[in-house]
Regions:
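Conserved inter-motif catalytic segment of the P-loop NTP-binding fold
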Residues: 55, 63-130
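Helical mechanochemical/support elements of P-loop NTPase systems and associated helical scaffolds
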Residues: 20-23, 34-37, 49-53, 77, ...
């Protein structure tokens, strides 16, 4: 089904323009999400949660898998993601117009259709009150949909919402910025993050992101 959807929807993208981008230089074993399960990636804005999601998508797409991102807040930036190594021709982007109910229905359709390596449900910009109103049966339905498959459902947000239905919970935290240049002309080289596996409990993993430009 995934191939059929992309064949129907794919359009030629525009040429990438020069821009700064955030690129994770590796994924540690601690951060590999389990297949056939729900994972949550949590953190505040600028905590590295989006960079981690992009790295997970890039790794999956590099293996030839088809992926999907369900964008509740219309915040996905294709240009920066292309610069981060994501092959857009194999990525389905679903825009939901800031309506979580549409995002949930889209996720349900995609998961039950099958054929996707990683499905990202981006709820980062949804308020905590909105997330609390999501009925719990949604998460049980999603868990049943991915069980015994090779798919990953990665839910991105600021607070945990899937409860016992999530097999993995990773919390991201921004640490230090790395600078070069002089005191008068500082240059930002990159940002360090820390990823803590809250479920299952494991040692925290340091991550390093670099800034650059691609034309």
């Amino acid at each position: 089904m995934a191939n059929a959807i992309l064949s129907a929807l794919v359009r030629k993208g525009t040429s990438p323009t020069e821009s700064s981008f955030l690129s994770l230089d590796h994924l540690s074993h601690t951060l590999r999400l389990p297949r056939g399960a729900i994972s949550e990636i949590l953190g505040r804005p600028s905590s590295g949660r989006t960079a981690l999601l992009h790295a997970i998508l890039a790794e999956s797409l590099s293996r030839g898998e088809i992926c999907a991102i369900i964008d509740c807040a219309d915040s996905f930036d294709p240009a920066s993601v292309r610069n981060n190594g994501v092959a857009l021709e194999r990525l389905l982007w679903v825009r939901c117009g800031r309506k979580p109910d549409r995002a949930l229905k889209a996720a349900d359709w995609i998961l039950h259709g099958g054929g996707f390596g990683v499905v990202v449900l981006d709820l980062c910009d949804a308020s905590q009150e909105t997330l609390r109103r999501i009925p719990l049966p949604w998460w049980y339905r999603f868990r049943r949909a991915v069980e015994n498959t090779t798919s990953i459902l990665a839910i991105a947000g600021s607070h945990p919402i899937a409860g016992s239905c999530a097999s993995c919970v990773i919390e991201m935290e921004r640490r230090d910025a790395r600078w070069s240049g002089s005191a008068h002309v500082p240059v930002l080289d990159g940002i360090d993050f820390r990823a803590a596996s809250r479920k299952p409990v494991r040692a925290s993993a340091p991550l390093r992101a670099v800034l650059g430009a691609v034309s």
